[in-house]
Amino acid sequence: MKIFGIIMETNPLHNGHSYFIKKIKEIYQPDVLIAITSTSFTMRGDISVIDKFTKTDQLLDAGIDIILELPFTLALQSADYFAKNAIEILNGIKITDLVFGSEIDNYEFYDKCLNIINNFNNYDNKFSKKQ
């Protein structure tokens, strides 16, 4: 059984989100598509333009099968912790695949960014020393 998880920050749901959900279903044909999303507050701490109940209805209408709420205390984090917390919850319910969108379709770019993050102390020391 293919159980796909997706982390969604919809404030509100727009055509890009709907297109992404549609493409996931067309291309991968998961048996279940589960979304985890923030509450009535966004990751940035803003009040969402729609409440979590309307957000849930919109996601169901867009084709999501199950919607999980990322608890407020886990959602109000930097993007990396927001994602980490959401992934931990999705892993806890045994998803088989995690799908996500990207504004840049160049894997090498993300690989280089990850390398910089993983080696930040080396970069920090290199650039912080006086020449």
Model-derived segments and spans:
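Nucleotidyltransferase catalytic core that binds NTPs
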Residues: 1-131
